[in-house]
């Protein structure tokens, strides 16, 4: 699944290319998993994928995800255009690797194409680490209308992780478990 996701790096994203949920769905489809199989007719792509994980995997908020875990984000854009940070499940990606400092490298599709970007939940408001290396990418574009303190980094917009494949048997979905009440907010 990760090799299929990596093969998409650099390909067009956004309106003219592959969006985030289509990118993630295609990567998992390469491993024989249809992430839309539990979708409700009203679900958007990210919602459909989260529903699949809720039914066939595990939703969690650990600080140390595993490679292959999904990462969900809220408020990556103002979907309902009301100027309020109330837009749940607006983006997702795939954790490619996790570094010793806790920085997860996330593969996801943006308006600039499929990219690899960092997210560090240990330091959610920092853009760089002690050595100047990037640890949190901007996910929500800054606008002149943003109030002070509006979240922009991936880590600030983090809504939870989803595990589809179990560590012991990477090709097998994990047992069904539910996170009570969905991914909790910090």
Q: What is each model feature region?
A:
Residues 81-186:
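Aromatic- and glycine-rich peptidoglycan recognition patches
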Residues 36-117:
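...with weaker cross-activation on analogous glycine-rich loops/strands in unrelated enzymes
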Residues 1-42, 50-54, 149-186:
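N-terminal capping segments
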């Amino acid at each position: 699944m990760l090799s299929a996701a990596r093969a998409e790096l650099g390909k067009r994203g956004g309106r003219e290319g592959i969006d985030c949920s289509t990118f993630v769905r295609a990567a998992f489809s390469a491993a024989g998993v249809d992430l839309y199989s539990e979708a409700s007719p009203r679900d958007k792509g990210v919602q459909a994928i989260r529903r699949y994980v809720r039914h066939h995997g595990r939703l969690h908020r650990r600080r140390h995800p595993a490679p292959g875990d999904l990462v969900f984000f809220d408020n990556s854009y103002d979907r309902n255009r009301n100027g309020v940070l109330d837009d749940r499940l607006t983006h997702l990606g795939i954790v490619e690797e996790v570094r010793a400092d806790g920085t997860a490298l996330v593969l996801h599709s943006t308006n600039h194409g499929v990219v690899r970007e960092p997210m560090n939940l240990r330091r959610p408001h920092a853009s760089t680490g002690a050595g100047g290396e990037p640890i949190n990418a901007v996910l929500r574009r800054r606008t002149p209308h943003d109030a002070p303190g509006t979240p922009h980094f991936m880590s600030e917009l983090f809504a939870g992780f989803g595990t589809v494949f179990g560590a012991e048997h990477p090709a097998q979905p994990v047992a069904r478990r539910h996170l009570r009440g969905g991914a909790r907010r910090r």
